[in-house]
Amino acid sequence: MDAALLLSLLEANCSLALAEELLLDGWGVPPDPEGPYTYCNTTLDQIGTCWPQSAPGALVERPCPEYFNGIKYNTTRNAYRECLENGTWASRVNYSHCEPILDDKQRKYDLHYRIALIVNYLGHCVSVVALVAAFLLFLVLRSIRCLRNVIHWNLITTFILRNIAWFLLQLIDHEVHEGNEVWCRCITTIFNYFVVTNFFWMFVEGCYLHTAIVMTYSTEHLRKWLFLFIGWCIPCPIIIAWAVGKLYYENEQCWFGKEAGDLVDYIYQGPVMLVLLINFVFLFNIVRILMTKLRASTTSETIQYRKAVKATLVLLPLLGITYMLFFVNPGEDDLSQIVFIYFNSFLQSFQGFFVSVFYCFFNGEVRAALRKRWHRWQDHHALRVPVARAMSIPTSPTRISFHSIKQTAAV
């Protein structure tokens, strides 16, 4: 059935139902002929609530919907909508007073989701602080700007931008989300662009390491502009194609949130999954070469495996391999769902922190450059103190009087 025809039928049913309701309540009185000639027509909103014909300037209340998205709501509460002076309905409907009726299982999940949200906020805050500090260190320490550290710097930049966009998404309330505002869709688009650039810079990290370690190709021949193009430019057409698809096929709910049967999000999720799979292959080859080199050394087997495991754990957040754990939801089991929620929230929100620690704060070049700057500052400060003392007027702890000088001269 055509969507426009279906909507008109629903609005017709809405008008009939409201007419019956008003007549039963004794409200079936025609409008005042001396009153205003413009009225807000009977309409059906996106939630499915019927709004009756109303006079301009009126604040109309209707019972909350009984069910929405499979959740039962308290119908004794009311939703509110204003009929504007020009005879049109306000675009925003106030559903803030509508409360869901949750059973014990839903209440438990609601509690876990609230705790997971706190973990997300904490992780993103800690990550942003660490990432900004790492960004400033790479900005100030010009002596360590080799290609490898430039790649780290760009990856850290994408983490910062992605986390900031995540905070902006949290500011969007339910009404704006349902209203599908233009600025809301723009924020979702920007967030998804930074998500894709973040993964593509993880791919760049994998390309660099695989080229240097597995292919034993001289990194001096690698071009910075090529990595910049891969990390920042390739995600642009991907996100543009996704935005066009959303605009024409799934233009609702600020383009955020995926429902069953929605395929447009795979336009950008597909390339992300592909680069993660490639990075997994890179990681396998890097660890394989590392194990081969460790076996050729004279160290004990236990130390060799320890070094290999350490290198693998350090590379996991850099290459984004941890995201592969969240490709598939564990299922309907309660314990699995709860573990999935917390594990997902912790790893995804704290990943920026781990990358900053492993590849900036624990970076030998960064620490050596910081020590060098610190010693230089100490030397410079130590030189300034004697000069300042030499320029000051010396004073004696004892005062010599003019009378004593005369006595000394007389002797």
UniProtKB/Swiss-Prot annotation:
Membrane-crossing segments per the record = 109-139, 147-171, 186-214, 222-249, 266-291, 303-327, 335-364
The processes (GO biological process) annotated in the record are: cell surface receptor signaling pathway; G protein-coupled receptor signaling pathway; negative regulation of angiogenesis; positive regulation of adenylate cyclase-activating G protein-coupled receptor signaling pathway
InterPro entries xrefs: GPCR_2, GPCR_2-like_7TM, GPCR_2_CRF2_rcpt, GPCR_2_CRF_rcpt, GPCR_2_extracell_dom_sf, GPCR_2_extracellular_dom, GPCR_2_secretin-like, GPCR_2_secretin-like_CS
Native organism: Mus musculus (Mouse)
Pfam family membership, one: HRM
Signal peptide (from-to) = 1-19
PROSITE patterns per UniProt: G_PROTEIN_RECEP_F2_1, G_PROTEIN_RECEP_F2_2, G_PROTEIN_RECEP_F2_3, G_PROTEIN_RECEP_F2_4
Task: Tell me the superkingdom of the source.
Answer: Eukaryota
UniProt keyword annotation of Signal present? yes
Q: What is this protein called?
A: Corticotropin-releasing factor receptor 2
Lineage of the organism: Eukaryota, Metazoa, Chordata, Craniata, Vertebrata
Q: Which residues lie on this side of the membrane: Extracellular?
A: 1-108, 172-185, 250-265, 328-334
Question: For this protein, what is any one GO molecular function term?
Answer: corticotrophin-releasing factor receptor activity
The record's similarity note reads: Belongs to the G-protein coupled receptor 2 family.
S-S pairs: 14-50, 40-83, 64-98, 184-254
Which keywords fit this entry according to its UniProt record? Cell membrane, Disulfide bond, G-protein coupled receptor, Glycoprotein, Membrane, Receptor, Signal, Transducer, Transmembrane, Transmembrane helix
GO CC annotation terms, alphabetical: cell surface; plasma membrane
Q: How does it assemble?
A: Monomer. Interacts with CRF, UCN, UCN2 and UCN3.
Topology in the lipid bilayer is annotated as: Multi-pass membrane protein
Tell me the compartments it is located in: Cell membrane
Write out the topological domains of type Cytoplasmic. Answer: 140-146, 215-221, 292-302, 365-411
Described purpose of this protein according to its UniProt entry: G-protein coupled receptor for CRH (corticotropin-releasing factor), UCN (urocortin), UCN2 and UCN3. Has high affinity for UCN. Ligand binding causes a conformation change that triggers signaling via guanine nucleotide-binding proteins (G proteins) and down-stream effectors, such as adenylate cyclase. Promotes the activation of adenylate cyclase, leading to increased intracellular cAMP levels.
Q: What's noted about domains in the record?
A: The transmembrane domain is composed of seven transmembrane helices that are arranged in V-shape. Transmembrane helix 7 assumes a sharply kinked structure.
